[in-house]
Design a protein with these regions (language model features):
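Terminal amphipathic alpha-helical/low-complexity segments used for targeting or macromolecular assembly
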Residues: 1-6, 51-56, 76, 155-156, ...
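Conserved N-terminal catalytic core of the sugar/cofactor nucleotidyltransferase
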Residues: 2-15, 23, 37, 41-134, ...
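A secondary-structure boundary/capping signal
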Residues: 16, 136-137, 215-216
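Active-site metal-binding loops of divalent metal-dependent hydrolases
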Residues: 20, 139
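Conserved beta-strand termini and adjacent loop/short-helix elements that scaffold enzyme active sites
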Residues: 108-110, 164-165, 252-254
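A residue-level structural signature of the nucleotidyltransferase/glycosyltransferase Rossmann-like core
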Residues: 132, 211-212, 259
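Conserved core of the sugar-phosphate nucleotidyltransferase
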Residues: 141-221, 226, 230
Length: 294
């Protein structure tokens, strides 16, 4: 399973989108949390765009019940396009058309919410025997070049799986999966272990896992035989720890901007930050914020 093979380019990505979005109820009672907009663009579109900008051309979205709106968003909308064309709204017509041409997007349903590892496993037939990326929808990562593009380059240079890490305050390490490093590695990028939400004061570092992975397909065999952990879920971290015994996993130390849009405060911050960067909104938003804070 772990014999050396010719390195392949990373062209496929998995975006897990099966969660119930309970933190955003009642807004998510009848719509996917992934479709909640950051101003005028749903959160999941930012994730898809990062994948495409990083060289991904085929994406599988692992969804659940009541997620049809995601499929509709990335599909062609004949009626809307016709309406925009008749109104002469060429700018918006181009934006709407571009959405359906971002990438080849496929869908598979995760029939039960059995954890991130299970969601990744649901895409096994689509991925086959190729290296692949995983992008979590709660994390909008912003950097130039994109985080995933840098990780793919690292994978293609080394042939090793890569996990994105971000430095967090020590008093916040209990909220994240935390990496321990192999001190014998001169690059200090070889991950020795992954500890899921260590107890306060027990973290081996303050480098936390954020929602980007580039993985060898060997992970599927480990996920297939993984034992359910807490709440009966199959955890990706457990199988990554096993993979690390046979094939080195490397860190990509992300230093850009991360928005946690799976958290209410993070969602509000993301909306404000994106608004402040837009020519059509920034001046009025700054004015409003100054008025509110004075």
């Amino acid at each position: 399973m772990f014999h050396e093979k010719k390195r392949q380019q990373v062209r496929k990505a998995i975006i897990p989108a099966g969660g119930l979005g309970t933190r955003f109820l009642p807004a998510t009672k009848a719509q996917p949390k992934e479709m909640l907009p950051i101003i005028d663009k749903p959160a999941i579109q930012y994730i898809v765009e990062e994948a495409v900008q990083s060289g991904i051309d085929s994406i599988i979205i692992v969804s659940g019940r009541h997620k049809r709106a995601i499929e509709d968003h990335f599909d062609k909308s004949y009626e809307l396009e016709k309406e925009l064309e008749e109104r002469g709204n060429e700018e918006m017509l181009a934006i709407v058309r571009d959405i359906s041409h971002l990438a080849d997007i496929y869908y598979v349903r995760q029939k039960e919410p059995l954890g991130l590892g299970h969601a990744v496993l649901c895409a096994r037939r689509f991925i086959g025997d190729e290296p692949f990326a995983v992008l979590l929808g709660d994390d909008i990562l912003r950097s130039e070049p994109p985080c995933l593009q840098q990780m793919i380059h690292q994978y293609e240079e080394t042939g090793s799986s890569v996990i994105a890490l971000m430095e967090v305050p020590w008093n916040q390490t209990h909220k994240y999966g935390i990496a321990a490093f192999d001190n014998a590695d001169p690059s200090h990028n070889r991950i020795l272990d992954l500890i899921e939400k260590p107890a306060p004061g027990q973290a081996p570092s303050n480098w936390a896992v954020v929602g980007r992975y580039v993985l060898d397909p060997a992970i599927f065999e480990l996920l297939e035989h993984a034992r359910p952990g807490k709440a009966g879920e199959i955890q990706l971290t457990d199988s990554l720890q096993q993979l690390n015994h046979f094939a080195p996993i490397l860190a990509h130390r992300f230093t850009g901007k991360r928005h946690d849009v799976g958290d209410k405060l993070g969602f509000v911050k993301a909306t404000i930050d994106f608004a402040l960067e837009r020519e059509d909104l920034s001046e009025e938003v700054r004015k409003y914020l100054r008025e509110r804070l004075d």
